[in-house]
Amino acid sequence: MKKYLVIGNPIDHSLSPRLHNYWFKENNIKAVYEKKQIRESDIGGIISEMRNGKIDGINVTVPFKKSVIPFLDKMQIPEKTQSVNTIYREKNKVTGSNKIVGRNTDIIGFKNSLGHIKYSIKGKKIFILGAGGVTPSIIYALEEMEPSVIMLCNRTKEKAQKAGLIYTDTQKKINVNKKRNAHNGHRATRRFQSLAKPEK
């Protein structure tokens, strides 16, 4: 029986095992899909288990989408996203050796979801709330869809800049503004990172 995992921290909330195991059962596939909470120091061991055939595939969620990259033999992702969410073994037909390959399905998944509802964002203003692990992939997908402006809002300026500055080749400007709001009796600072495409 094949074994698949989703790794992250935290991971208790993940519904991936329920979805995948249902799909396996409905399609008569002899496989099991589990979730595993790990630390960054565990990544090497997990990849070794995969290389040795104990694990057949891995999905990766926060906060490890970037930190798994040094353990891979090959990546099939846009380099500037620096985000891997799927890992699998690729067998060399000549030597018989296994390569551990990382892919990013966030990009095509986001594109397909918009395509499914037949919604075009060309020329529209886009607002992204949060700069988590999937954000660089979403920005990459959006850039190919030609919106007029992409605005990224995050609690910390540094993380917003890290997610946005990957795309300096397509940016017209970066504006960082501060807005103060009352929150639980304290003054909370929120920083807004604004990314804009060059006008054509």
Predicted regions and their residues:
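Residues at the starts of beta-strands that form the adenosine-phosphate
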Residues: K3, V32, K125, S148-V149
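NAD(P)-binding Rossmann-fold cofactor-contacting core
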Residues: M145-T170
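Glycine-rich adenosine-cofactor-binding loop
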Residues: G8, N104-I107, L114-G115, K122-P147, ...
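Conserved acidic residues
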Residues: D56, S148, R180-H183
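Phosphate/diphosphate ligand-binding glycine-rich loop within oxidoreductases
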Residues: K2-I117
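Short, charged/polar "capping" segments at the starts of alpha-helices
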Residues: S67, K157-K162, F192-L195
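Rossmann-like adenosine-cofactor binding region
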Residues: D169-K200
